[in-house]
């Protein structure tokens, strides 16, 4: 088994606390609403949303994958940090054991925020992760962020 790391940063015009509330804490409800072409639904299979919770994310018909299961590893409200692991389905296939993800949202002096994202791909056997594949996953996540950001800009009273 190998572990491949991919780190990235993305900026947002939305303040850190508001973005954390919308994108992380209520993302299970908001993302299927603002990006139904990407995610059909999110349901808690076990747990209450905190560490140990298992979620099933269902993708729309025509997507390359039907679903993915994720386990919540950490929710740090004070530091706007969220960690979770993809543990079943989706892109894991025969080559990945799991993908561990950490998102930390940091306030910027201009009132916006920076999302610092760390992904750890745990491969099966001697499989290697290609940079293009990791970049494609990052771009999909960024598209979800932009959909949430657009919603928040259009609904200034939401998630304050």
From Swiss-Prot:
Which Pfam families does the UniProt entry name for this protein?
Bet_v_1 (PF00407)
Q: Does the keyword Nuclease apply?
A: no
Entry function: May be a general steroid carrier protein.
Task: Name the coiled-coil region(s).
Answer: none
GO MF:
abscisic acid binding; protein phosphatase inhibitor activity; signaling receptor activity
Name the family the entry cites.
Answer: Belongs to the BetVI family.
Chain sites annotated for binding brassinolide = 55, 82, 84, 101
Name where it's found.
Answer: Cytoplasm
Q: Does the keyword Cytoplasm apply?
A: yes
Q: Which UniProt keywords apply?
A: Allergen, Cytoplasm, Pathogenesis-related protein, Plant defense
Question: Organism's domain of life?
Answer: Eukaryota
Q: List GO BP terms, alphabetically.
A: abscisic acid-activated signaling pathway; defense response
Q: Which GO terms describe its cellular component?
A: cytoplasm; nucleus
Q: What is this protein called?
A: Major pollen allergen Bet v 1-M/N
Name the encoding gene, please: BETV1M
């Amino acid at each position: 088994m190998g572990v491949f790391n991919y780190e990235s940063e993305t900026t947002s015009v939305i303040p850190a606390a508001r973005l954390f509330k919308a994108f992380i804490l209520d993302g299970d409800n908001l993302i299927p609403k603002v990006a139904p072409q990407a995610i059909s639904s999110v349901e808690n299979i076990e747990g209450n949303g905190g560490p140990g919770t298992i979620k099933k994310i269902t993708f729309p018909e025509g997507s390359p994958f039907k679903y993915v299961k994720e386990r919540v590893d950490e929710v740090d409200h004070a530091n706007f940090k969220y960690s979770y692991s993809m543990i079943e389905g989706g892109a894991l296939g025969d080559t990945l054991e799991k993908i561990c993800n950490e998102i930390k949202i940091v306030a910027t002096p201009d009132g916006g925020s920076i999302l610092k994202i760390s992904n750890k791909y745990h491969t099966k056997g001697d499989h290697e992760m290609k940079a293009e594949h990791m970049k494609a996953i990052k771009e999909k996540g960024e598209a979800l962020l932009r959909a949430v950001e657009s919603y928040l800009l259009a609904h200034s009273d939401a998630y304050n």
